[in-house]
Regions:
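Buried hydrophobic packing segments
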Residues: 22, 26, 206, 297-308, ...
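Extreme N-terminal starter segment of soluble prokaryotic enzymes
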Residues: 2-6
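N-terminal glycine-rich phosphate/adenylate-binding segment common to multiple enzyme folds
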Residues: 50-159, 245-247
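N-terminal beta-loop-helix "entrance" segment that forms/cooperates
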Residues: 34-58, 228-230
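Buried hydrophobic positions in well-ordered alpha/beta secondary-structure cores of metabolic enzymes
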Residues: 12-15, 68, 134, 176, ...
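Glycine-rich phosphate/nucleotide-binding loop
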Residues: 46-49, 230-330
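Glycine-rich phosphate/pyrophosphate-binding loop and the adjoining helix
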Residues: 138-139, 143-183, 187, 193-195, ...
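Glycine-rich phosphate/diphosphate-binding loop of Rossmann-like nucleotide-binding domains
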Residues: 7-24, 28-30, 153-224, 236
Length: 356
C-alpha cells in the first residue's frame, strides 16, 4: 500500500467545513485504490494569528515542505482587518508561495452542462467550455521595483516596473506545454508584444518553446483580444499561458464566465510542494452554518491527486462524481434554483461520496 503525506490547512471562515468535506471524499477515494494518507493539520491565516500571533509559522512551513501536497481552505476575514499590515492573514499565502517556490498558478475553467444557465453568457457560447489558465506567479510588475506618489499637484507621479527574465518565461512555458500535452494539445500564449518590451521577450521565448514542442498547436494573442475572445468564443481555448498581471485579470474573467465561483479549483506549483485551494474566499458570514459549497475544494483535491499524488484515476473518479451530483440536481444555496435539491456542505460531500 502506497503512503502519502498531505498537509491540511483549513484557514478561516468556512475553511474548516469545506476542508472537512474534501477530506471525507478523499478518504473514501483513497481507500478504494489502496492508498494510505497521513493527514497533517496546520494553521495559517487568521487562525494562526489568533493562536501564534503570526499568519504563518515556521512549523507550518516545514510541514508543507516535507509533504506530498498542501490542501488549503481559505484565509482572511473582517476580524483581522485592523491588524498590522505585515501580519495580515493573506500574508500566509504569499509566504507559502515564496517558501515552497510556487511560480505557477493553474486555474481551470469548466462549465458543466447542468450549470450552463448560471453563466452570464448565452448557452450556445458556453457549451464545451473547458480550459486552463497557466499564470506566472512570482515575476512581472507585481514583484518589480516601484515608486509611490512623488511630486505635488499636477506633477504628482508614481511608477511600477515590469521585468521578466528568460528563466522565468521558459519555466512557465514548459508547464503550459506539459499541461496541454495532457489535454487537447493547444496553447495560446498571451502578451502585449505590440507595446511592451517585456512582452516581446515573452513572445520570443514562447515561439522558441513552440518550435521545440511541435506536437502542441501554439498561437499568440494580445491580452486585449484574449479578453474579448473569452466573451465571444471561450470554447476555443484549451491552455492559456500568460504573465502575472494578465493572468490575474483573465482568470477572474474566466471565473465570472463560469457563473459558479464556488466550483472553481486552483493549483499553485513550482519547485517545491504544490498548494491546492478553491478560488473563493472565507465567507465568514456563513461559517458554521453548513451552507458553504464544498465542490471547489473537492475539485482542488482532485487536481492534487492528478498533479502531485500521481493518482489520475482518483482525480477522474472525484471529478466524475461531482459532475453526476450536479446532473442529479444537488445544489448548495449559492447555485440553487427552484425545483432542485437544496443541500448543505456535509450533504453535498456525502452525495459525491455515494457516486464515487
Amino acid at each position: 500500500m502506497s503512503e502519502k503525506n498531505i498537509v491540511l490547512i483549513p484557514g478561516d471562515g468556512i475553511g474548516t467545513e469545506i476542508i472537512a468535506a474534501a477530506k471525507a471524499v478523499c478518504d473514501v477515494a483513497f481507500e478504494k485504490v489502496g492508498v494510505k494518507v497521513n493527514w497533517i493539520d496546520k494553521k495559517a491565516g487568521g487562525a494562526s494569528i489568533d493562536a501564534y500571533g503570526v499568519p504563518l509559522t515556521e512549523d507550518t512551513i516545514e510541514a508543507c515542505k516535507n509533504a506530498d501536497a498542501v490542501l488549503l481552505g481559505a484565509v482572511g476575514g473582517p476580524k483581522w482587518d485592523n491588524v498590522d499590515p505585515s501580519i495580515r492573514p493573506e500574508k500566509a499565502i504569499l509566504g507559502l508561495r515564496k517558501e515552497l517556490g510556487l511560480f505557477c498558478n493553474l486555474r481551470p475553467v469548466k462549465i458543466y452542462p447542468s450549470l450552463q444557465e448560471y453563466s452570464p453568457l448565452k448557452k450556445e457560447l458556453v457549451q464545451d467550455v473547458d480550459f486552463v489558465i497557466v499564470r506566472e506567479l512570482t515575476g512581472g510588475i507585481y514583484f518589480g521595483e516601484r515608486e509611490e506618489v512623488q511630486g505635488e499637484g499636477a506633477n504628482e507621479f508614481a511608477w511600477d516596473k515590469e521585468t521578466y527574465s528568460r528563466y522565468e518565461v521558459e519555466r512557465i512555458m514548459d508547464i503550459a506545454m506539459e499541461t496541454a500535452r495532457k489535454r487537447n494539445k493547444k496553447v495560446v500564449s498571451v502578451d502585449k508584444a505590440n507595446v511592451l518590451a517585456s512582452s516581446r521577450l515573452w513572445r520570443k521565448i514562447a515561439q522558441e518553446k513552440a518550435a521545440a514542442n511541435p506536437d502542441i498547436a501554439t498561437d499568440y494573442f494580445y491580452v486585449d483580444n484574449t479578453a474579448m475572445q473569452l466573451v465571444v468564443n471561450p470554447a476555443q481555448f484549451d491552455v492559456i499561458v500568460t504573465t502575472n498581471l494578465f493572468g490575474d485579470i483573465l482568470s477572474d474573467e474566466g471565473a465570472v464566465i463560469s457563473g459558479s465561483i464556488g466550483l472553481l479549483p486552483s493549483a499553485s506549483m513550482g519547485t517545491g510542494t504544490a498548494l491546492y485551494e478553491p478560488i473563493h474566499g472565507s465567507a465568514p458570514d456563513i461559517m458554521g452554518q453548513n451552507l458553504a459549497n464544498p465542490l471547489g475544494t473537492i475539485l482542488s483535491a482532485a487536481m492534487m491527486c492528478r498533479h502531485s499524488l500521481d493518482l489520475p484515476q482518483v482525480a477522474d473518479a472525484i471529478e466524475n462524481a461531482v459532475e453526476q451530483v450536479l446532473v442529479d440536481g444537488y445544489r448548495t444555496g449559492d447555485i440553487y434554483r427552484e425545483g432542485l435539491k437544496r443541500v448543505g456542505t456535509t450533504e453535498m460531500a456525502q452525495a459525491v461520496i455515494e457516486r464515487l
